[in-house]
A protein has these predicted regions:
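Bacterial N-terminal signal peptides
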Residues: 7-18
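Short, flexible beta-strand-to-coil junctions
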Residues: 52-54, 174-178, 337-340
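N-terminal secretory signal peptides that target proteins for export/translocation
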Residues: 1-4
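Compositionally biased alpha-helical segments
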Residues: 20-149, 154-157
Length: 397
């Protein structure tokens, strides 16, 4: 009897895991049409499918599929949610170490169309000029390391957990800054994330000069000697789940998270997370490590009330970007590392996943504390690290 129960249990576990292990699947709609595709995400009653035939992502209503496919999609969502729930309980990483010898595959080279496509394990790089495998490998390491960092953070951002075999994040590379700007890149930027609903996770656009590539003869060589915080920042946006852009989190947390990853000391495929506190403080209050970059807010910061700051429209947040990004970094770091544990930020992120937003979600973060008490705790924590934050009176209280 015991053996029968054990076999039944094992079979049940295998059946539960099967949908998670499958790659592409033949989906059938109610009219009998078939499509070979892989799920990239599901939101409410819409599923995004990466179609094998053309490599593009399409959004479809769940209702158009036959019952067995709808059940498969629901099971896929359930498995993703289980993975997210487990990730919340993982320890905070101290070191992200990425393999430097990553495999690069050339999937398309079309001189006439100026389209050259390269695959690393989790990224698709689409460039308007030919690059060697070795050059792509050099800069792809930073992309892969950033994704691994986001995957290891116990914040359950599912986009960082989707295997490259199912969905590669798209990166558009441009030979010239002029071409980058013509295609929508901000003139003063070194890279940008553009959210596109029908393009899966959106795209990141980067001019080659931002990757440290220099033209030598008819080819390119990698000669990057500086620090690149813009690219990890934009890559984090590409990997951040949509729920974390909801009101109450959009701005202070979505940008604070991107800043947190970007300022982490990085070298040769390694993010040294254990060294983050000094890097966070130096970047937010000064000009960063070695005087490169930084928000330079100073050691005494006069801030809006916490409630007004967290609930301000995103357009207002970006209108004063340098200050708000720096303060967002300090506050995000507080919730990650300066409370007794991460239970409050975890509960807040879970609430966002469940559909809460705005003040309703922030009440979960406060966990019974008043806004005045929350401000006092943040101020006290940072004062002990040499940063004095003074919050103004709220205009909405």
């Amino acid at each position: 009897m015991y053996m029968m129960k054990l076999v039944t249990l094992l079979l049940g576990c295998l059946l539960m895991l099967a949908p998670c292990e499958l790659g592409a699947r033949m989906f059938t709609d109610v009219d009998g049409s078939k499509i070979d595709a892989t799920i990239t995400k599901v939101e409410k009653d819409t599923v995004s499918l990466l179609v094998k035939a053309d490599g593009k992502v399409y959004d479809s209503r769940l209702s158009i599929f036959r019952p067995n496919d709808r059940n498969y999609i629901r099971e896929w969502v359930r498995r993703q949610e289980l993975e997210a729930a487990y990730n919340f309980d993982d320890p905070w990483p101290t070191l992200i170490n990425t393999d430097l010898d990553i495999e690069i595959e050339i999937t398309e080279e079309d001189e006439e169309k100026k389209r050259f496509v390269y695959h690393s394990p989790n990224y698709e790089f689409i460039c308007d000029v030919r690059l060697s495998k070795n050059v792509v490998k050099k800069f792809a390491t930073l992309f892969e390391a950033t994704r691994e960092y986001c995957r290891m953070l116990p914040i359950a951002t599912l986009k960082a957990h989707v295997p490259g075999a199912q969905f590669r994040n798209k990166i558009l590379l441009f030979e010239s800054k002029a071409s980058y700007v013509r295609n929508g890149g901000p003139p003063s930027s070194a890279g940008v994330f553009i959210s596109r609903g029908r393009q899966g996770n959106g795209i990141v656009m980067v001019p080659l000069e931002s990757l440290g590539l220099k033209k030598v003869g008819s080819g390119y060589m990698y000669d990057y000697k500086g620090e690149n915080k813009v690219l990890p920042h934009e890559l984090v946006h590409q990997l951040t789940d949509r729920e974390y852009y909801r009101s109450g989190a959009r701005g202070w947390f979505s940008e604070g998270l991107a800043e947190y990853v970007a300022v982490t000391p990085y070298r040769s495929g390694k993010f040294m997370v254990r060294s983050n506190l000094s890097a966070v403080k130096a970047y937010a209050t000064e000009y960063g490590k070695k005087g490169k970059g930084g928000r330079a807010l100073g050691d005494e910061i006069i801030a809006p009330s916490l409630k007004d700051y967290m609930l301000q429209p995103y357009s207002e947040f970006t209108a004063n970007a340098n200050f708000n990004y720096g303060l967002g970094l300090l506050i995000t770091n507080y919730y990650f590392h300066m409370e007794e544990d991460r239970s409050n930020i975890t509960a807040f992120l879970r609430a966002l996943k469940r559909g809460k937003q705005g003040e309703e979600a922030l009440r979960v973060l406060l966990n019974g504390r008043s806004w005045d008490e929350m401000e006092e705790q943040i101020t006290k924590a940072w004062r002990s690290r040499g940063v004095k934050i003074t919050f103004r009176e709220s205009v909405s209280r």
